[in-house]
């Protein structure tokens, strides 16, 4: 390059300046080619001051340099350019080859893309990942494991489409060719069948293991097992869809197991309830007993003692602890406002067996009845929802689940019915029997609200079939006790004033009237069953109250004949009952939002004012209104006389 610069008479400074100019002045507006020519323009050396010899010498040197350039530099430059041309030609050939290959690859890519557009869906449809296969075979069965069931079910549907397309020999068009299965499709089908069988076998073993756990000697809460099964509830529909007979066998095995489970569980629970201590309500708790002439504080000739063997046997001691009965206990028994809590309390928690076995509190029979039947209802509810959610079959209906529940709980129902029979058979607690009837009514409506099948309602109807006849027997007993009551004119004793010598039977109520008033108010309170209207006249309670009322009026008529003014005596006693009924009626209107929760004490000073609001009266039971009107009519009749 130095020789070339010398031949072209290029100054180094000029050359450097040219490089700097081309590098830095990129925004220069002049033509770069013109600038180059201007900078590289050959300038002949000035010969003004040179001698001819010097000029000759200079020309010789120039000639020598030119010859050297021609003989040495130019050939090398020619060789370099020739080699460069050859290399450029080779590069051009390589580029042509690359271009040709690129076109070939582009064509191949387009071809493969066209093919993959048809093959990729098939691969995605038929592919089963190895990780999924490993999880199906070895993975823990839990909520995430159920995704394998969904995957296999989807694959089975896709495989069935390919099978149907293969069977269709006329399907030759290109549009449906993508749905034609590959040659090794049969092997894929075999793999799918194997995986289905693995899922079926593992699911079956899981369900059987849970059923065996319920049958173990160590007590295991059934709801814990049910919750574990509900977390993997997709396994049973898969069994049902692929092996219906196996699904039915598993469900039947579960039903047999739960039948045994509930029978054992409730047998132990009933034994615990049997240990409960109950109040002694015997034949001494009768109308006419506990009065001045029929005191039970000592041995006497009370008329009610005549019926002490009316419905009793020695077996009654198995349920009731015999304790001395006092007049105060009899008087307290006829007031049941505290016992109404069992019908109005919002907390419906069942008494656990440990508490029942260690409870030293005296209980009434409705406590045992409600706890047992409420426990059965709660378990029926849980079992119903589990059968519906886990063991659902195609086309399952309400009647089939009802049949399964009845199969599971029938032994339990039989034991509960036997317990109820033992509970009331030797007991004279007429209020306890009636409260138990109201508890059964409430449980019937609660089961309907929960959507429980009719089997539980049928069970409660069976309980009511036992309770109502026993109630009628006790009504007969009370009516007979009323008819045997002593015919006297003794007035009632009041707290703080035990002397009755200054009280006249014409101005103060008879002691039997006060006792009957408490009894009647308690009975009428229990006439309120539930919010849904029913035909009250169809209930035995309606006619029973009328029977008791008629027998009481017969006794009062006999007692009035021993007074100077029978009409005034009857008017005084009926007025007392009428005022009691007015108080009850008034409080039913005040507490209309919760018609079964009353506070009788706060109404002691209420006069003869009657609530005449028709809207409020509609919430008061018919028997209360009729009884109130009946005594009102009697008061008016005897007052006019």
Swiss-Prot record:
What are the recorded GO MF terms, alphabetically? syntaxin binding
Query: Which classification does the entry list for the species?
Result: Eukaryota, Fungi, Dikarya, Ascomycota, Saccharomycotina
Gene Ontology biological process terms from the UniProt entry: actin filament-based process; endocytic recycling; Golgi to vacuole transport; intracellular sphingolipid homeostasis; positive regulation of macroautophagy; protein targeting to vacuole; retrograde transport, endosome to Golgi
Q: Which domain of life is it from?
A: Eukaryota
How is this protein organized at the quaternary level? Component of the Golgi-associated retrograde protein (GARP) complex, also called VFT (VPS fifty-three) complex, composed of VPS51, VPS52, VPS53 and VPS54. Also interacts with TLG1 and YPT6.
Coiled-coil regions in this chain? Answer: 81-110
Give the keywords, sorted. Coiled coil, Cytoplasm, Cytoskeleton, Endosome, Golgi apparatus, Membrane, Phosphoprotein, Protein transport, Transport
Q: What membrane topology was assigned to this protein in its record?
A: Peripheral membrane protein
Spell out the protein name for this chain. Answer: Vacuolar protein sorting-associated protein 52
Family per similarity comment: Belongs to the VPS52 family.
Other known facts: Present with 3130 molecules/cell in log phase SD medium.
Function (record text): Involved in retrograde transport from early and late endosomes to late Golgi by linking the vesicle through the t-SNARE TGL1 to the Golgi, leading to the membrane fusion between late Golgi and endosomal vesicles. May also be involved in the actin cytoskeleton organization.
Q: Where are the transmembrane segments?
A: none
Alphabetical list of InterPro entries matching this protein: Vps52, Vps52_C, Vps52_CC
Name where it's found: Golgi apparatus, trans-Golgi network membrane; Endosome membrane; Cytoplasm, Cytoskeleton
Tell me which residues bear Phosphoserine. Answer: 602
Annotated GO CC locations: cytoskeleton; cytosol; endosome membrane; GARP complex; Golgi apparatus
